[in-house]
Amino acid sequence: MSRARVARRIAAGAAYGGGSVGLIGAATVGLVLAEVQLAKRLVGGGKAPVPPSADGRYGVAFAGPSDPLRFVLLGDSTAAGQGVRRAGQTPGALLASGLAAVAERPVDLRNVALPGARSDDLERQVSLVLADPSGVPDVCVIMIGANDVTHRMPATQSVRCLSTAVRRLRTAGAEVVVGTCPDLGTIEPVYQPLRWLARRVSRQLAAAQTIGAVEQGGRTVSLGDLLGPEFEANPRELFGPDNYHPSAEGYATASMAMLPTLCAALGLWPESDHLDGSRREGMLPVAKAASRAAREAGTEVTAARAPWALLKHRRRRRLPAHTEPVPHDDAGTDTDGGPMPGRGSGATWRRA
């Protein structure tokens, strides 16, 4: 069965309440997951530090009459920024800083991601987001899937939970970008041939996630091997000290690939009708676009006229220098939204 058909079967099972769709043999899956769990114990020692909080305001130098953009991150430890020590090195901070630079507006970041979360935790996370009295976010990023694989969550259930989360956020009025399941074959203590099998399971889930998210009005970016052959070529640099979560450089690599899609979702990125064939862009059936994106890290998939989707390889944008958040209470704005003298200095982000 082709990769596209497998992804479509999983997505269809999720949409219509079907049971689990087998990805590969159950015994093989169990062996893969046992090795991945062993790898996590070897590299993490069973104790993971709490990710630094990056909640706050970015781009305070752009304060003006417009309200700040509201940006929320949901998902698992990757979305939370597990593996780095400084808030400014987390994907939330990197994306918020980049978004502020492109929009030339402050950005308020809220991160509700939970390390260890699976897709069934998205219901709780979305409810937290929609209950926020400050209003519906302008854009949300969801990064989820690795724990679904390692804990053997049925793929149909995983995709159903993600699709529901995207639908709820889109119905409320938020734009949604999903970073799909990363490639578990890049974890160093997982060896061949299990590394190949872990990669296959991860990619099949990523493709099915793409179909589910796009059909609910979201956009996806394939994280794959966390966005590029750099990870396999330089694992010591792009993985963190635990060899399982990304390092600061790894998160920056992933964020550079996601930022253009985040900006495009908000209408801040120039959209061209031209599809660059040399970059393998094109209009494809959703399932085929999803399958291809899962194999090519950093690929964006967005809905076109059903049952088609646009597959794009946006050029990565250099991120601003690492920045730390400004707490909302100290963002240096008065009641009219203008800068307050003597406040917000030293911790605000400014253009380089």
Predicted regions mapped to residue ranges:
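Substrate-gating cap/lid alpha-helix
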Residues: 187-222
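Surface-exposed cleft-lining segments at the edges of enzyme active sites
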Residues: 81, 111-119, 146-156, 194-198
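Short, conserved phosphate/pyrophosphate- and ester-handling motifs at nucleotide-, phospho-/glycolipid
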Residues: 247
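Oxyanion-hole/transition-state-stabilizing segment in secreted/luminal serine hydrolases
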Residues: 120-157
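Alpha-helical scaffolding segments of alpha/beta enzyme cores, especially the outer helices
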Residues: 157-171, 204-211
